[in-house]
């Protein structure tokens, strides 16, 4: 979830994508009925809507971010809780809170410059994430809840890799908070929010294999819930060794 500048019409994009899907279905039905003219007409509508939606989405998000109001944050939290409630009703067993994106932006000292209860101290910056967790647990008490914990890592030259998340020491402290709040599982991952795909999917040789494992091990040492690692774990053998060494409980391959 992101909040963009007012002219970035997120709902409008969603409507365009939905209408493109409908037009695509109508085109397929017309083609199946050998109605070439109608099929071409609907396919053209589908293509134009899809192109327009992607054009609106294709930009650097950082240039469009605004500070979310408390009212907006509350509305988003309530929507997330409603989604969790519906998921539980549908028979879903587990839900992952993606700790990057909006939550990671609020946690991050790089992106969060607020001066209210959601900015400044670690307690304030992580407040919203914990509120979201609590809202989900209240809305869907029988669901297993995982938190994807993004770590801002440090490159060999001292520069930061990733923006939306927490530096390692703060991430370990936040993991304790999540554990105390009743999280069922934590996945330690690389933070992103940089606009550079190479930060989260680094070029071959740019970072070592299993490069988030050190942070994962530190998190695992302070919590009681299972902890997963992800980040250039590319073979079954590597994953098995991590499990045998006890540095993580679950492996995210890739």
What does each model-identified segment do?
Residues 1-253:
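Flavin-dependent oxidoreductase catalytic cores
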């Amino acid at each position: 979830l992101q909040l963009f500048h007012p002219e970035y019409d997120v709902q409008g994009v969603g409507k365009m994508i939905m209408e493109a899907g409908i037009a695509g279905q109508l085109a397929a039905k017309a083609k199946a009925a050998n109605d070439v003219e109608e099929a071409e007409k609907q396919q053209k509508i589908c293509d134009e809507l899809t192109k327009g939606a992607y054009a609106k989405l294709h930009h650097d998000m950082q240039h469009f971010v605004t500070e979310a109001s408390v009212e907006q944050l509350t509305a988003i939290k309530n929507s997330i809780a409603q989604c969790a409630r519906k998921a539980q009703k549908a028979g879903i067993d587990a839900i992952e809170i993606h700790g990057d994106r909006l939550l990671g932006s609020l946690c991050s000292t790089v992106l969060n410059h607020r001066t209210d209860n959601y900015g400044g101290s670690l307690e304030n910056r992580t407040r919203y994430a914990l509120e979201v967790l609590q809202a989900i647990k209240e809305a869907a008490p029988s669901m297993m809840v995982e938190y994807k914990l993004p770590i801002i890592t440090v490159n060999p030259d001292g520069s930061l890799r990733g923006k939306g998340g927490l530096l390692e020491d703060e991430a370990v402290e936040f993991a304790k908070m999540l554990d105390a709040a009743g999280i069922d599982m934590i996945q330690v991952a690389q933070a992103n929010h940089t606009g550079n795909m190479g930060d989260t999917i680094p070029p071959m040789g740019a970072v070592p294999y299993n490069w988030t494992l050190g942070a994962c091990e530190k998190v695992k040492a302070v919590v009681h819930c299972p902890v997963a690692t992800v980040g250039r774990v590319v073979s079954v053998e590597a994953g098995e060794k991590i499990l045998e060494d006890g540095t993580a409980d679950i492996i995210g391959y890739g």
